[in-house]
Amino acid sequence: LNKSVNKWLLPLALIMVIAFIFAGCSTNSTPTTTTSSATTPTTTTPLLTGSFKIIGSNTVTPLSAVWAEDFMKANSKVSIAVSGPGSGVGIASLIDGTTDICQSSRLITQSEIDQAKAKGVNVYQIQVATDALSVVVNPANPISELTITQLSAIYTGKITNWKELGGKDATIVVMSRDTNSGTYTYFKEAVVQMAELPTKDTKLEYGNKVLMLPSTEEGVSQVASNPNAIFYAGLGYLNNTVKAIGIKKTANDPAIKPSVETALAGTYPISRPLLYYTNGAPTGVIKAYIDFCLSATGQQEVLAAGFVPLKK
């Protein structure tokens, strides 16, 4: 009997071992989204590839350049080209289909949206940061604060001498970004046309003696070397060669200086959104890039660049 039992037990044991081995193989053959070790690459994050262009705002360009550099370091098969000829050029490029992302320091107009629709472009807006637009003078200038009404008078040409504002007897050298700039448009709407705050006078325009400059960098440089100059620039462009003055919404309001803190608190009178525009909701590598810009890491870059991160 023992011989008979042994005769059947051995083959049965072999069958069970083989079945166990095959069962193990079957379990491992199903794809999973987790990794078996720290050195095995995950199957859930596909390799990002592709190239795209970002064109537009001179103000947003330094921020986009940092984001693009970081994103390309993390994704070696991605190429991003960033240029900053102005928000108007960026919006025109989006409408014409010559850029993938328009970076803008102003809101797109209804007229531009209509032009885009006529060309089959579905404008999609994403706010990526906030800016506190700063009014700067030379550090030697004794003026430390101005009202919106006074700023409007300076830029329309009603006030032409610093002594009219309690300063030195010297002609004010008034400088602005050029008409392609979103900052030019925003400052006109938020300051120049707000002489009788809160009423907006759309007939008011920049005075004919205002010097129009092609870049923010040039304006800051001019103010640094000219004690009688005034200019406006994004918060990220401030440095110790110029002085940002406090802005009073009205004569009875306190003067508020531009900073991340005052912009986040909503107390600084000249704050604005910084925007990306795409043709339809972003997808693929462009969506991955914008998701990075909006991530905690991307918003830390906003702060490091001197702009205001989005509230979470």
Map each language-model feature to its residues.
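Bacterial N-terminal signal peptides that target proteins for export
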Residues: 2-12
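Hydrophobic helical h-region of N-terminal Sec-dependent signal peptides
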Residues: 14-18
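N-terminal acidic, proline/glycine-rich, low-complexity intrinsically disordered segments
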Residues: 1-2, 27
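C-terminal motif of bacterial Sec signal peptides marking the signal peptidase cleavage site
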Residues: 20-24
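Short linear motifs in low-complexity, proline-biased tails and propeptides
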Residues: 11-13, 299-300
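Exported/periplasmic ABC-transporter solute-binding proteins
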Residues: 26-312
